[in-house]
Amino acid sequence: MDRFLVISSDGHAGPHAADYRDYVDPAFRDAFDVALPIQIRMTEEAAKSFLVDDINREWRKGRESQLAGAWDAEARDKVLDADGVAAEVLFPDGVTEMNAPPFGAGFSMPPEGVTADLQWAGCLAHNRWMAEFVATAPERRIGLACIPVLWDIERSLEGIRWAHQNGLRGVIFPPRWGHFAGYHHTRYDPVWEICQDLDLPIHFHSGPAPIEEYFGPMPAPEGHEIQPGAMGIYITEVAQWLVRPLTFMLWGGVFERFPRLKVAITEGTAVWVPEYLALLEQRYSETHYSQKLGDYRSHLSMSPADYFRRNVRVGASCMPRREAQMRHEIGLGTIMWGTDYPHPEGSWPYTREQLLETFQGLPESEIGRMLGGNAAEFYNIDTEKLAPLVARIGPEKRLFVDPARSPA
């Protein structure tokens, strides 16, 4: 084929916040009605901290119908076609479109400030909506279920089974666990086992972090001033919080006990991977400096870095050329490119131009792996079903040939 298969590892979708009501269990709809205006107000406060409102409003002008693809399947397919994206992995949405799931659900699922029953109600509402949305084009939508696994293992197993039975193809877990046991604890073994057996990759998405430490209380009291450096601190540390669950799982022997378990780390850049792997290798190695620490390796048959290479993939959203040039250090088989539609920091509506900027001049086979091949393998996507679509919309390979650009 003379066109690339493109699979975005990072897309966001969800209905208008008020429209979640029909998907919430009836027992929780009164609570939903009370919580909705509070959620909207807090989302608006978050937008003031995380988005430059004037720039965001300007960016949205004239694009409203295309941004409706966050909840409208027909509009979304038009956007995907224009971008050359054949399939995508779908996370919940949030601040940008003011459509986060209710009750602290979504890809954050914080363990504080919400009750277990309410957070479960919000997650199940989103999962029901996502299952319907995926059904509009199951060959190109890889929907993910929100599972607030910290609260109740048995309930989590039920939610995971439901997700699998209803066409969802992965799960999202909270990256921060607060007062609950970390992911090295064996209490989660039944969860790892079912995700392995059903071949449902586990996802951690960038964003959650101790926001109040950077920006102060939210909603902010009148007259509150955000301190210098808050955003810089956040965008530096947020990747650390994203990777932290993985560190617990790697050292905890999760991938030793469950060798076919899959984990994706999404929208936290990929530039951190080489140094992270180097650190894991160093800490695993027998050295004079670690002798006094006792035996912390015998439960592992290989280094944590090797488990990473085998079991983990990185959703490299809005990937810059610098990361493409680091592809062998990161791991060519580790990278899964993503567009991050419909967020303003993503590649849309200039995805085709961004792809050329990032990948032009690199070997065709390597571009193919990063743009879609790795994701197709990770999610067991039937590429034959996508072939007619790719033949119509996929980026032409000839455009990526440029002898003047270094393939390094």
What spans do the regions from the language model cover?
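Short, flexible, mixed-charge acidic loops at enzyme active sites
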Residues: 95-106, 215-225
